[in-house]
């Protein structure tokens, strides 16, 4: 049982690492589309690419954010005394809250994604992509990175 609890304490670090890495991947890969040297081609192809690509990568979001929430909550309820004694409880709570805060950007993100998919502004969709990239980077720095750091602190304290 102790081994399972130790694993449970570490799992939010793993799942939030995946989320943070995905955000970084998005920034690096999607950022290619706004480079001046390919802007003309990007404006022609980005809406179709994004629409089809979104169907392929959305599973990462559908799986890993709820996993973060579930693991954060499970950690708060299993062996609570140990978490209180070590001070890890507040770090799991903060990690969970930062992870949930990612969703505060949901409507903004969906609006920008719709603009990309609908080629808005017409013929200059890279403008919308640039706005999405800025929002995504801000969101990663303000929610995903702190969640990851909090889950690391929690695991270090709990173990």
Curated annotation (Swiss-Prot):
Residues 1-25 form the signal peptide. Keywords: Glycoprotein, Membrane, Oxidoreductase, Signal, Transmembrane, Transmembrane helix, Virulence. Glycans are attached at residues 124, 136. One of its GO terms (molecular function) is oxidoreductase activity. It is an enzyme of class 1 (oxidoreductase). It is found in: Membrane. One of its GO terms (cellular component) is membrane. It comes from the Eukaryota. Pathway: Mycotoxin biosynthesis. It is a multi-pass membrane protein. The chain crosses the membrane at residues 59-79, 96-116, 139-159. Its EC number is 1.14.-.-. Its main location: membrane. Belongs to the epoxidase xenD family. Probable epoxidase; part of the gene scp cluster that mediates the biosynthesis of a hirsutellone-like compound that has still to be identified. This is Probable epoxidase scpX. It comes from Mollisia scopiformis.
């Amino acid at each position: 049982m102790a081994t399972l609890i130790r694993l449970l304490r570490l799992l939010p670090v793993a799942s939030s690492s995946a989320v943070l890495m995905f955000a970084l991947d998005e920034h690096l890969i999607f950022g290619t589309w706004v480079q001046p040297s390919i802007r003309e081609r990007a404006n022609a192809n980005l809406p179709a690419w994004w629409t089809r690509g979104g169907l392929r990568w959305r599973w990462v979001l559908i799986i890993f954010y709820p996993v973060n929430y579930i693991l954060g909550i499970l950690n708060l309820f299993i062996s609570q005394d140990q978490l209180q004694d070590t001070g890890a409880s507040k770090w799991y709570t903060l990690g969970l809250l930062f992870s949930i805060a990612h969703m505060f950007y949901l409507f903004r993100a969906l609006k920008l994604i719709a603009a990309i998919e609908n080629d808005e502004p017409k013929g200059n969709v890279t403008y919308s992509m640039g706005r999405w990239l800025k929002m995504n980077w801000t969101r990663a720095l303000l929610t995903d990175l702190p969640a990851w750091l909090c889950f690391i602190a929690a695991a270090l304290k709990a173990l």
